[in-house]
């Protein structure tokens, strides 16, 4: 069987916090996974944000078929207005993330002279779709914002799996819940490469999900007097 030519090019998020962005090339088609910014170091005066370099994408703009955003935080979607000025490809995102993207781009149109018409496609967290002949699987992951997803792109040699930012928490409420079963199904089909988030992976123990803070905050408000 003839194999696909696959290239994986990280443009941000490597050995740094934020600015996440990957380019996956399958059969000469480019898929962009996330497009975030990061804030500069405290001594970098006069710089508001730092975004990835889009030079490679500008040179290959005709081959970019999709921009996939995994969740609604600036470190994975904040550079999108600047990316669209360089490469205007269809955007795919889960519902809440798509709403946040829409609001962000409308703000840029109003305040930053952003004039790009964009195509925003809403996907479900468990969707299986096809983009330009390439099967794409979405799977729910647990993160501090609801509606977060991971993405699996099919190749003849196996899936390229991009987890996004995640923790494993089987007690998460609906909207935050991950789908281990869907991940297992993708794994059984064969995985060529796993692109996995590693923030705080050197820390021992478990990460406490932010969505579990609600009960503790509620108690503080209820027990406080004179307010």
Predicted regions and their residues:
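His/Asp/Glu-rich metal-coordinating catalytic cores
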Residues: 1-68, 73-227
């Amino acid at each position: 069987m003839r194999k696909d030519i696959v290239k994986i090019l990280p443009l941000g998020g490597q050995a740094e916090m934020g600015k996440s962005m990957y380019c996956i090339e399958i059969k000469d088609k480019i898929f962009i996974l996330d497009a975030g910014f990061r804030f500069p170091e405290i001594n970098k005066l006069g710089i508001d944000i730092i975004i990835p370099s889009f030079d490679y994408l500008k040179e290959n703009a005709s081959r970019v078929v999709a921009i996939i955003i995994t969740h609604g935080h600036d470190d994975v979607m904040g550079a999108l207005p600047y990316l669209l000025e360089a490469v205007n490809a269809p955007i795919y995102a889960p519902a809440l993330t798509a709403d946040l993207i829409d609001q962000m781009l409308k703000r840029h149109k109003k305040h930053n002279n952003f004039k790009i018409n964009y195509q925003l496609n809403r996907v479900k967290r468990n969707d299986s779709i096809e983009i330009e002949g390439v099967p794409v699987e979405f799977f729910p992951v647990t993160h501090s914002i609801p509606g977060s997803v991971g993405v699996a792109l099919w190749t003849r040699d196996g899936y390229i799996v991009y987890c996004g930012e995640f923790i494993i928490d089987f007690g998460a409420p609906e909207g935050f819940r991950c789908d281990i079963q869907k991940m297992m199904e993708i794994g059984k089909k064969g995985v060529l490469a796993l692109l996995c988030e590693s923030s705080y992976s050197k820390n021992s123990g478990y990460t406490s999900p932010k969505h579990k803070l609600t009960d503790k905050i509620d108690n503080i408000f209820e027990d406080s007097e004179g307010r």
